[in-house]
Amino acid sequence: MLKDLCFEIIQTCPNHCLFCSSVAGMDKHQIIDYDLFKRTIDYFMSIGGIEEISISGGEPFLHPRLFEMIRYCKINGIKTVLFTSGIKMRNKMTDDDKQQLEFNLRQQYSSYLNEGMPKEEYENLITKLMNDYLKYDARTFDSLSTYDCHLLKNLGLDKIIFDFQAWNKDTYNQIMGSKDSFDFVTLSMIKVKSAGLVADAHFISTKVNYKELPDIVEMLNVANFDQLSILNFVPQGRGKDNESILSLSEEEFQEFIQIYDKCKEQFHGNLRIGIPLQGIDTHKCTAGFDKLVIKYDGTVLPCPAFKEYDIKKLNALGIKTPNIHYNLEDIKVHHGTRKQPLCKQLYKFNKSIQ
């Protein structure tokens, strides 16, 4: 059985994160179509099954058939986790919607005319209200709707994980490479918890944001989040280009450990440390055995830490890199563990929090 499958279904993303391993953005258009997704799931189910799948991107909420993908995973009895930045494309109003909106506004404020408001002033009021609605409608992105969140709950989604890197809006905009999206994200986080979903957050400590952790913990406590994962910055993809402005110095890392120790006592949920930051290899690495990643272009890799790693080096380590577009049936699931996490071997990680 495949224990852990991470499936990047799209490279398109509303953000332009400084550390993004997938080099995702709105100018990227590679996508896994629904039929290929189903065929891949069917293949793994035929050779032993899938215990857990993590659906990610890019931003998976920009995939037109995301909800169908989640439904298909749950039909097959797979524990399904969704990774997101909490942003989706805004559903624009049609001309009919706008006409209905204006009609409703006129009905709602008709008493103003009856109470003596001048006709011209009334028309100016309706115009202003319409313009306010249309200004909001002109936005490209939006938060998840209450309907979205309840649909995810009804589909049986097991967990949703938010990429949440800062509480200060300027810091958030800098590290996420976006503008005016912070409020969408926080609103989405509140909505998913209100819908009863299990919700976690991921935080990558960098020069830009490592001092933000206490404020993030406070917000997650208010939102009643279940878990916060502290992840190591991996210099791959866009992160490799920005390594000098992201990678913590030894002094900064030691300061972050002190911040982490305080936050560990304050967070109401579970505070988890990613494998590369664990001092002792308590987690037995299964990368390339019964743990796999499928990129947005169909390439199959052993672990998310290697999405931009040199393919020849991986092959030299005995790790095959097939592609679901061309040779899906060549993918084999093995069992076993590595003596040391593969990410620590290849990236020479030697810092630890625990």
Description of each model-found segment:
Residues 1, 23, 299-300, 304-354:
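Flexible mid-to-C-terminal extensions adjoining Fe-S/redox cofactors in radical SAM and related proteins
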Residues 5, 9, 160-162, 201, ...:
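A structural signal for short, well-ordered beta-strand segments
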Residues 6, 10-13, 278, 296, ...:
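Residue-level signal for mature regions of secreted extracellular proteins and peptides
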Residues 13, 17-20, 285, 303, ...:
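Short cysteine clusters
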